[in-house]
């Protein structure tokens, strides 16, 4: 029962942090110090990635009409715009496949530590504040996904590669990149959500494949633990996405920047104290 409760808490953390630009990894590094599943490391590593499937499904459910090119309620123009949106998303994910996929395991092996995570939290927190201050009196060049050029989509996809560095935040890197290029906050957030679908779905499937291909099995309650994490992640991510979309209608991302800086300092302070 305790392991199920831990899965609920980890699902909540994943659901809240996956689409807010605050780094799910940064939070899991801290949470892992206090709430660690009493399971083999191989299962825990797989669990931490695969619970993202719940967050992905939250995007699919929330945006099902917008993302469905076969909807009978859409006009021919709207169906064409939906197909074009998917083309932009697929093009944007290419840099992660070409560059990110080969580097992923190396990054996890060499950079997955509290110091890298905390530095990334702080650096990107500062960047959010600086860029928002710079853009506060500027009109966005792209205020609709329909007007977003393919070259801008692929540039945003290039920013996603930065999220290979633990603590960066996939949504943080893509939203920051999109705003820097000149999109509105709303377009930046939505495109980041859509870009997550192939990116995170692919990452989750790859992790599952590696888990089972290397002899992993779901023993005891592990299947239930994984299912609970995915379901909780879905419910919380759904609420988190709705919150963010409502928030950025009237506010900017500076609060998230300050939050990242504070969290980064807390991570450094906590592990520095542990070392002594």
Swiss-Prot record:
This protein's source sits in the domain of life called: Bacteria
What InterPro entries does the entry give? Answer: UppP
List the molecular function annotations (GO) for this entry.
undecaprenyl-diphosphatase activity
Q: Does the keyword Protein transport apply?
A: no
What are its GO cellular component terms?
plasma membrane
Using the UniProt record, give the first listed, main subcellular location. membrane
Further information in the entry reads: Bacitracin is thought to be involved in the inhibition of peptidoglycan synthesis by sequestering undecaprenyl diphosphate, thereby reducing the pool of lipid carrier available.
For this chain, the family text in UniProt reads:
Belongs to the UppP family.
List the membrane topology term(s).
Answer: Multi-pass membrane protein
The record's subcellular location field reads: Cell membrane
Pfam families assigned: BacA
Q: What is this protein called?
A: Undecaprenyl-diphosphatase
* The entry's keywords: Antibiotic resistance, Cell membrane, Cell shape, Cell wall biogenesis/degradation, Hydrolase, Membrane, Peptidoglycan synthesis, Transmembrane, Transmembrane helix
Parts of the chain that traverse the membrane = 2-22, 43-63, 83-103, 111-131, 147-167, 186-206, 224-244, 255-275
Query: What's an example Gene Ontology biological process for this entry?
Result: response to antibiotic
Q: Which NCBIfam families match?
A: PRK00281.1-2, PRK00281.1-4, PRK00281.1-5, undec_PP_bacA
- Please describe what this protein does: Catalyzes the dephosphorylation of undecaprenyl diphosphate (UPP). Confers resistance to bacitracin.
> EC number(s)?
3.6.1.27
**Reactions this protein catalyses:** di-trans,octa-cis-undecaprenyl diphosphate + H2O = di-trans,octa-cis-undecaprenyl phosphate + phosphate + H(+)
PANTHER family reported for this sequence:
UNDECAPRENYL-DIPHOSPHATASE (PTHR30622:SF3)
């Amino acid at each position: 029962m305790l392991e199920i409760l831990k899965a609920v808490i980890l699902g909540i953390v994943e659901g809240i942090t996956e689409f807010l630009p605050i780094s799910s990894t940064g939070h899991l590094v801290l949470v892992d110090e206090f709430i660690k599943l009493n399971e083999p490391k191989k299962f825990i590593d797989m669990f931490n990635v695969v619970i993202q499937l719940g967050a992905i499904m939250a995007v699919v459910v929330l945006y099902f009409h917008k993302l469905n090119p076969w909807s009978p309620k859409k006009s021919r123009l709207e169906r064409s715009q939906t197909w074009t949106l998917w083309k932009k998303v697929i093009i944007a994910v290419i840099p992660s496949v070409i560059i990110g996929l080969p580097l992923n395991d190396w990054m996890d092996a060499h950079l997955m530590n509290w110091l890298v995570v905390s530095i990334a939290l702080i650096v990107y927190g500062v960047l959010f504040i600086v860029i928002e201050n710079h853009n506060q009196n500027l009109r966005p060049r792209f205020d609709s996904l329909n007007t977003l050029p393919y070259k801008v989509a692929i540039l945003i996809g290039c920013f996603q590669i930065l999220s290979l560095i633990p603590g960066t935040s996939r949504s943080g890197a893509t939203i920051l990149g999109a705003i820097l290029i000149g999109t509105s906050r709303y377009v930046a957030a939505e495109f980041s959500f859509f870009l997550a679908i192939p990116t995170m779905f692919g990452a989750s499937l790859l992790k599952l494949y590696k888990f089972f291909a290397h002899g992993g099995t779901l023993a005891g309650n592990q299947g239930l633990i994984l299912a609970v994490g995915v379901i909780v992640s879905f419910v919380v991510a759904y609420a988190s996405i709705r919150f963010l979309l409502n928030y950025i209608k009237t506010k900017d991302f500076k609060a998230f920047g300050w939050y990242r800086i504070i969290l980064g300092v807390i991570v450094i302070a906590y592990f520095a104290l542990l070392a002594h």
